[in-house]
A protein has these predicted regions:
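Class I SAM-dependent methyltransferase SAM/SAH-binding core
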Residues: 66-68, 72-120
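Conserved beta-strand signature within the Rossmann-like core of class I S-adenosyl-L-methionine
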Residues: 156-165
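C-terminal alpha-helical "lid/dimerization" subdomain adjacent to the S-adenosyl-L-methionine
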Residues: 165-212
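N-terminal auxiliary segments of SAM/dcSAM-dependent transferases
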Residues: 1-19
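Conserved Class I S-adenosyl-L-methionine
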Residues: 198, 202-236
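A short, conserved alpha-helix within the catalytic core of class I
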Residues: 140-151
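A conserved beta-strand element that flanks and buttresses the S-adenosyl-L-methionine
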Residues: 132
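Class I SAM-dependent methyltransferase Rossmann-like catalytic core
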Residues: 16-19, 23-49, 53
């Protein structure tokens, strides 16, 4: 039987999934999420997995990175700063279905933001070096999530990284308690707990990837972060 809090999360609507949400609330939530990514390790986890594909790349190279569901663009910018220390330039493309989010990603600079559907990426096959999505998959249960993974696999040339949340009551309690001293918006506090209970176990994330036709290497990270990575064509 599904845990009652998982059932509650499954039937709840997060602010970023609400087409009627006020733009100011969306932007405030995105800025809170950027702090969560920094403090709880989401940005670091994604960057670590991207490093696996960047390691063979020589200094002086320029590599394209598409971030699907980029939010405020904080994770690709963190990855670019990390790559720059190794002499690699990342050309950042941020894709969002929410116009306010695309504007917020572009506002801080460094990310070429566009509005499009992650289930139908507007790129040719193997036209982007690296493709990332962070904390997006738990918003897309079932076939929409599998379609996103297939599309990411299609457009990537070197590698794909999916970063999300490892489901845990401790993670839910942690984000709830941290939200007060960090002065999160009330919507972020609620949605943070919803997101945790919509998250995955390592086995579940691997199974979703397999059901989309890709074989991913799944890893745990500090801060209840979970990642999956593979090379295009489905080989981990």
């Amino acid at each position: 039987m599904r845990h009652p809090l998982r059932a509650w999360a499954a039937r709840s609507t997060e602010l970023l999934d609400d087409p009627e949400a006020d733009e100011r609330d969306v932007v405030a939530s995105l800025r809170d999420i950027a702090r969560i990514n920094r403090v709880f390790g989401g940005a670091a986890a994604a960057a670590q997995r991207l490093d696996e594909f960047l390691c063979p790349i020589a200094a002086g190279a320029t590599i394209s990175l598409l971030d699907v569901g980029t939010g405020a663009g904080d994770i690709p910018r963190a990855a670019a700063a990390r790559a720059a220390r190794r002499g690699i330039a990342l050309r950042l493309i941020g894709l969002e279905r929410i116009k306010a989010a695309a504007r917020e990603a572009a506002r801080a600079g460094g990310v070429a933001a566009l509005v499009a559907d992650g289930g139908r990426l507007p790129f040719r096959a193997a036209s982007v070096d690296l493709v990332l999505c962070a904390k997006v998959l738990h918003h897309l249960p079932g076939e929409p999530g599998r379609q996103l993974l297939r599309e990411m696999n299609r457009v990537a040339r070197l590698g794909v990284v999916v970063a999300d949340i490892r489901r845990s009551v401790f993670a839910a309690a942690g984000i709830w308690l941290a939200s007060f001293p960090m002065r999160f918006q009330p919507a972020t506090r609620r949605d943070g707990v919803i997101s945790v209970f919509r998250g995955f176990s390592p086995f579940e994330l691997g199974a979703i990837c397999r059901s989309a036709g890709v074989s991913a290497a799944v890893r745990r990270h500090p801060g209840w972060c979970l990642t999956a990575a593979w090379r295009p064509g489905g080989c981990a």
